[in-house]
Amino acid sequence: IRRIAIVENIIYNNYLEKNENAPSLEEMEEFKECIPWICLKGLVWASENIYIKNKAKDEIKEIILDNPIDEYKETRRMKRHFYLHVGETNTGKTYSSIKRLMEAESGVYLAPLRLLALEIQDKLNSENIACSLLTGEEEDIITYAYHVSSTIEKLQLGTPYDVCVIDEAQMIADNQRGWAWTRAIIGVLAPEVHICMAPEALDIVIKLIKDCDDTYEVIRHKRDTELIVEDKKFNLERDVKKGDALVVFGKKKALAVSAQLLNNNIKTSIIYGSLPYSTRKKQFDRFLSGETEVIVCTDAIGMGVNLPIKRIVFLETRKYDGVSMRKLRVSEIKQIAGRAGRKGIYDKGYVATTKDIDLIRDALKAKPKKIEKCYVGIPESLINIDIDIIDALKTWSSMSLKGFYEKTDITRIIYLLNRLKKLDIDVSNEDIIKMATIPFEENNKTVFALWEEYCMMYSAGAVNLMKPTLKKNASAKKELDELESYYKSLDLNYSFGKNFNMMINNRFICSEKENTANKINELLLTNLLDHERVCIGCGKKLSWDYPSDRCRMCKIINDSKKERYDYRFRERRHADYRKNRRRRRY
């Protein structure tokens, strides 16, 4: 036992040298809960899992307020009135709110997407109302403007406005981004606040307003155009009509469908999530001008520009959500299908699908489940705590909240913080949290590598931020992906430089983004057939949803070759096994 104790002591002293925040042996002895665990699991385990976590909990309890609304003291001194615009998609909720925003001397529009923020900025500026833009990826600050169009995460809480418009408030239920809607509702400094939402969000928003001791009134918006679900299953080869929006879930599928239709002499506009705003706008304009008669899109069509779409067609009724393939939710079907039948252009809107007609029909009749919880983000006071930031966040996340509040999902943030830890990034807690919450696409390898490079540059004290470079000589099929990655890298270059006051070349970024967006649009016009699905064996054309990379004949031949190879491999293994047995015998 003595030897074990001596070795354990040596190991822990080495651990203390590497971890400054770890407790001394005397501190752990004073903490009675640690003693039985030291005997069972050892000093290091007891330090990390018992002492630090419990100490963190005690410190966090002291600094975190019981009610999230108390964080916004200046707002609590203001008397606010809320106008709650409730209705399904395409009912004019946002239109009514923006009208009021335009009448005010100063105001802010808070959007769920950069696309919507840009759209509203364009709208206000076209009406001679100077409006700035503020998003995670770009800014367009007009010095004399009293109106701001912003993504909701970029709301400047200390700035007072006459009118605030919060759009798509049902996203308060999103476990990663919902905190931004909660923060805006309880923290925005505006005496008049308009909130646009789907019906399922009404109850939770009212609870928040009552918790703030503010007043409200509900304005219900009804759909004027009837929405009809077609009984007949849709066939892509023969049923496409002018004014259709064909919905799939994935960029590759959208490109494959468009290529297949182009082969049938049907020109399309293409809309998907990673498409730059200016490219997307050009695709919209082609549809609006009649140059194309059909839109092929992902669920990105669910929010944004109201286009003259007569019929929404679900080419798929299942989507991959990052974990598994699942059926579309009621709220998703309503959001997308609601785009059919634009008010003032069509008297009726139509919805069709290639399969699962009952799923679509039932979803449109159903009432979505009411939202019962709203999410809160990481409190600012937590960032200044004298504990390892990862331990502090994990401990905070495990602590329960009172009432209808729920903590935001910090899985992504913890993952990025651990990556920074491996890179030995030595910056303040405030800066490291800023690094982990900066908007960028971590699933894109090129962009992720650039983010790591930028974090290391800042940590090393660099002043100038390295420009991203475009990978050249990419194949025709990969060129689109490379251009989109480059555009995202330019976004990251701008947002990182702005967040950390590093020197960036604004003129270069704007010029490169414009050129890249134009090149992407050109590729969608000229190289679309490169994305047509063909058999990798013989080159035969395949349908966009064909279940294999090979045509039927090539698959049969390939499978038989594989069977013969597997048979030979098994025979060879058996022969080697028998040979080795004979050798061992002698």
Regions found by a protein language model. Give the residues of each.
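Non-catalytic terminal extensions of ATP-dependent helicases
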Residues: I1-E62, P379-Y586
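Conserved interdomain linker/interface between the two RecA-like ATPase lobes of SF2 helicase motors
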Residues: Y83, P199, D203, L208-Q260
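Conserved Walker A/P-loop ATP-binding site and its immediately adjacent core
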Residues: T91, Y95-I98, E103-S126, A201
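Conserved strand-helix element at the start of the C-terminal RecA-like helicase core
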Residues: S106-I120, H194-C196, D239-N264, T268-Y272, ...
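Inter-Walker segment of RecA-like/P-loop motor cores
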Residues: L124-P160
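Conserved helicase ATPase core of P-loop NTP-dependent helicases/translocases
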Residues: L133, E139-I141, A256, I270, ...
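Post-DEXD/H (motif II) to motif III coupling segment of the RecA-like Helicase ATP-binding lobe
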Residues: Q170-K222
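Conserved segment of the helicase C-terminal RecA-like domain
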Residues: P199-A201, L307, R311-K367
